[in-house]
Amino acid sequence: KLKLKEGQLLIGLCWRTSKQSFHDLRVEDLAPLKSLRDVVFLAVQYDDCLSELDQVRSLGLPIHYYTNVDQKDDISSTCALLGACDLVISPGTAVFQLAGSLGVPTIAFDAFKCYFDKIPWYPTVRELELNPDKPSLLINEIINEMPEIIGWANAVTTSGRYIDSYSGEL
């Protein structure tokens, strides 16, 4: 069981699709996220990612993962994990679809942005464009805009949990 300190955010992190395409982030792209303070990351990657998690951790980004949850075939447990998150970051996968369906504030990224800030059928999903040649731009945008993202997440959350106590600084 994850225990968060007061003011910490739980961010669910999915960095790639199962088919591994240009819509994905690479493990090394995630390293700058370690600059975010008062954040706990939870891997919500729905396939075997244990070796990638070792790589992520070796880059200095602590991330939790529940090995006892089959995030691909046990939808109810996956939804419980996603529902516990204050924010989810994911490419265009089932993870973002489930989080959006649950009303969890979600940053969805894709190489082809739909050219509207929010997806009409998922009002708690904000879409950001991923430049496959420069994925660091997306990560830097998330890091630099985290206070605004928190404000947006508080405005759209349907969980009733507000994360305005976040005290992280860059």
Q: Where do the protein language model's features map onto the residues?
A:
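Catalytic machinery of carbohydrate-active enzymes
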Residues: 1-170
